[in-house]
């Protein structure tokens, strides 16, 4: 479904991506972008994008699902977890990557639940998106935790309880 990969032996000039999780941004017509996530606690950045890449909504195909509620997550991994739990979910590639035109893409959903990390960036993301869309309901994860942390400690039911499901 998400077609994740691992960069074992990168092409010359792309060594920076070695050992990273490859996260493709898929559309019905194919891959439109790819981001890379560090799998260890090295000193480098947690996420890398290709030079010159623009931001996109992750898991855009979820927008075609028949559902009254959409979950918007902060990050690709959180989006994958939310989807596996059973939510119709899309993600932003980080809390600070909201683009004003995303409101047109997300308009029309009966209810949009924002799964926000329990930090300042998550709170700012909630404020920004809530100013642009009327049907937004922020769901904050505990302090310094994200969807993945809650899933690992409380399981799928812990996430479902947060939205009353």
Task: Indicate where each model-derived feature is located.
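Short, surface-exposed amphipathic charged segments that create phosphate/polyanion-binding patches used
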Residues: 104-108, 148-161
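Acidic beta-strand-to-loop metal/phosphate-binding motif
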Residues: 72, 109-121, 140
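Glycine-centered helix-coil hinge/cap
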Residues: 59, 75, 134, 155-156, ...
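Short, aromatic/basic amphipathic alpha-helical patches
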Residues: 124-134
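Short, acidic/turn-prone active-site loops that include or flank metal/cofactor-
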Residues: 93-98, 117-119, 141-144
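A polyampholytic, Gly/Pro-enriched intrinsically disordered region
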Residues: 112-118, 154-165
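Hydrophobic anchor at the start of a short beta-strand
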Residues: 89-90, 112, 135-138
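Phosphate-handling DNA/RNA-contact segment within nucleic-acid enzymes
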Residues: 2-110, 125-126
């Amino acid at each position: 479904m998400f077609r994740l990969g691992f960069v074992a032996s990168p092409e010359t000039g792309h060594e920076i991506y070695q050992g990273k999780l490859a996260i493709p941004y898929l559309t019905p017509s194919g891959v439109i972008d790819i981001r890379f996530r560090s799998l260890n606690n090295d000193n480098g950045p947690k996420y890398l994008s290709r030079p010159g890449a623009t931001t996109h909504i992750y898991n855009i195909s979820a927008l075609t699902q028949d559902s009254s509620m959409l979950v918007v997550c902060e990050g690709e991994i959180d989006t994958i977890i939310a989807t596996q739990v059973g939510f119709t979910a899309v993600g932003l590639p980080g809390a600070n990557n909201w683009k004003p035109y995303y409101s047109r893409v997300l308009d029309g959903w009966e209810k949009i639940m924002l799964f926000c990390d329990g930090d300042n960036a998550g709170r700012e993301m909630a404020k920004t998106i809530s100013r642009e869309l009327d049907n937004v309901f922020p769901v904050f994860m505990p302090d310094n935790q994200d969807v993945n942390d809650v899933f690992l400690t409380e399981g799928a039911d812990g996430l479902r309880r947060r939205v009353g499901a």
